[in-house]
């Protein structure tokens, strides 16, 4: 997985309820290539150096494996232009991507919207657009008591996504780890630690 292959599948999306959602769509797995039989070379993955990351606006902190790449996407909507900020970190020689995205709602919409409805719609849209099956879900709260939802799902290509979504101060955050079945087993504790490290910083 490369950042170029991931970014086109992350976008601001609307559904019939009018909610603005961040959807993470995973690319389809490439067709299998037949290779001559040979004993594979086993190489140990390079352990990344994790460090605390804070975005330019200072509204959250999270542990990331190195400096994430940043991408900004702009979407015109009936509420005006919505900016989607995307941060992606991918350790070398590991089939995993650590992603944080957020988008701000217009003030009036943020005041009126039901956080749980936004979270439920985000879950449904993620499953639909990635053609995935839900593995587990639970309602959660951020460390400063903002509503959230954790979901885990798998698509037909075997990619597993574990995501925590939060609605706070007119903003929808999504914190995700996308990996393969094989890597998920070895990275389960690392992914949990990554998700647990996410902290929302309230506006002053």
Regions found by a protein language model. Give the residues of each.
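Bacterial N-terminal signal peptides
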Residues: 10-17
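Bacterial N-terminal signal peptides that target proteins for export
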Residues: 1-10
């Amino acid at each position: 997985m490369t950042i170029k292959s991931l970014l086109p599948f992350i976008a601001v999306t609307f559904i019939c309820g009018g909610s603005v959602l961040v959807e993470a769509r995973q690319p389809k797995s490439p067709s299998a290539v037949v290779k001559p039989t040979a004993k594979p070379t086993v190489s140990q993955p390079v352990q990344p150096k994790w460090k605390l990351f804070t975005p330019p606006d200072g509204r959250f902190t999270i542990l990331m494996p190195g400096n994430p790449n940043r991408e900004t996407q702009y979407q015109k909507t009936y509420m005006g232009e919505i900016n989607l900020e995307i941060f992606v970190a991918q350790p070398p020689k590991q089939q995993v991507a650590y992603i944080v995205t957020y988008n701000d709602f217009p003030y009036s919409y943020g005041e009126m919207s039901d956080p749980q409805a936004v979270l439920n719609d985000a879950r449904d849209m993620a499953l639909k657009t990635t053609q995935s099956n839900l593995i587990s879900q639970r309602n959660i709260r951020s460390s400063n008591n903002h509503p959230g939802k954790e979901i885990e799902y798998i698509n037909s290509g075997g990619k597993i996504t574990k995501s925590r979504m939060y609605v706070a101060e007119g903003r929808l955050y999504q914190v995700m780890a996308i990996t393969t079945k094989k890597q998920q087993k070895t990275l389960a504790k690392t992914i949990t630690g990554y998700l647990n490290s996410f902290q929302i910083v309230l506006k002053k």
